Amino acid sequence: MIIFPAIDIRNGKCVRLRQGDYNQETIYSNSPVEMAKEWEASGAEYLHTVDLDGAKSGESNNINIIQDVAQALSIPIQVGGGIRSLEVIDKYIQAGVSRVILGTAAITDSVFLQTAVESYAEKIAVSIDARNGFIATDGWTKNSTVEAIPFIKQLESIGVKTIIYTDILKDGMMSGPNFQELDAVQQATTMNIIASGGVTTEKDVQQLKTMNLYGAIIGKALYDGSIKLQDILEGEMDAR
């Protein structure tokens, strides 16, 4: 299972939000590039980055910073947040980003999603941000009437290979992932599943590993020190 340290960027800084609430922000670093280098130095094999400004506005506000992050690292990065055009996908791919994550656009524009998957294949992932079983959009600020599980099955049928599944009510709450929901997602698809939201302890990480998930994104727990990246990565190496 790949561990993805999370770098969420807002106003050019590395931050974390509680349950996606833009009014509950903690700034962890003024330099996302330096933060990314720290995670790479600690042994990270893949990085997860989000343009929070972009997720809310639909514009790729922090694209230059994310390009700098991609070019500063020797490990792959995946990027999400406000990516709603083929032009922006192409900019990220050209900048060295390994995987581009579509969120709102994947829900609201099926033609765009299909074209993106046909054009970029496994370089496209889709973010499923769920609240009580329904998908939220626009940086989690809007609830949709789209049910998560049927939509996940639909994604697989059009050729999506990787999804990021986030339980919004768990995100940043340090209360553990929603294992029951993740199990339901896993039963519904053979796509690569990256779990996100609520990973708080090494025990959470171990439980996710037993589910044979493709990956887990960890944010607040790494920044607050309740999980040490090197410790869980050493556990990964021992298990291999």
Swiss-Prot record:
- To which pathway does this protein belong? Amino-acid biosynthesis; L-histidine biosynthesis; L-histidine from 5-phospho-alpha-D-ribose 1-diphosphate: step 4/9
Active-site residues from the entry: D8, D129
Chief subcellular location equals: cytoplasm
What is the E.C. number?
Answer: 5.3.1.16
Question: Which EC class does it fall in?
Answer: isomerase
Q: Keywords in alphabetical order, please.
A: Amino-acid biosynthesis, Cytoplasm, Histidine biosynthesis, Isomerase
Catalysed reactions listed for this entry: 1-(5-phospho-beta-D-ribosyl)-5-[(5-phospho-beta-D-ribosylamino)methylideneamino]imidazole-4-carboxamide = 5-[(5-phospho-1-deoxy-D-ribulos-1-ylimino)methylamino]-1-(5-phospho-beta-D-ribosyl)imidazole-4-carboxamide
**Pfam families per the UniProt record, alphabetical:** His_biosynth (PF00977)
Q: Which family does it belong to?
A: Belongs to the HisA/HisF family.
Name listed for the protein in its UniProt record: 1-(5-phosphoribosyl)-5-[(5-phosphoribosylamino)methylideneamino] imidazole-4-carboxamide isomerase
Parts of the chain that traverse the membrane: none
InterPro entries given in the database record: Aldolase_TIM, His_biosynth, HisA_bact_arch, Isoase_HisA-like, Isoase_HisA-like_bact, RibuloseP-bd_barrel
Report the record's Gene Ontology biological process terms.
Answer: L-histidine biosynthetic process; L-tryptophan biosynthetic process
Q: Which Gene3D superfamilies match?
A: Aldolase class I
Q: Which GO terms describe its cellular component?
A: cytoplasm
Q: Name one GO molecular function term.
A: 1-(5-phosphoribosyl)-5-[(5-phosphoribosylamino)methylideneamino]imidazole-4-carboxamide isomerase activity
The subcellular localization recorded is: Cytoplasm
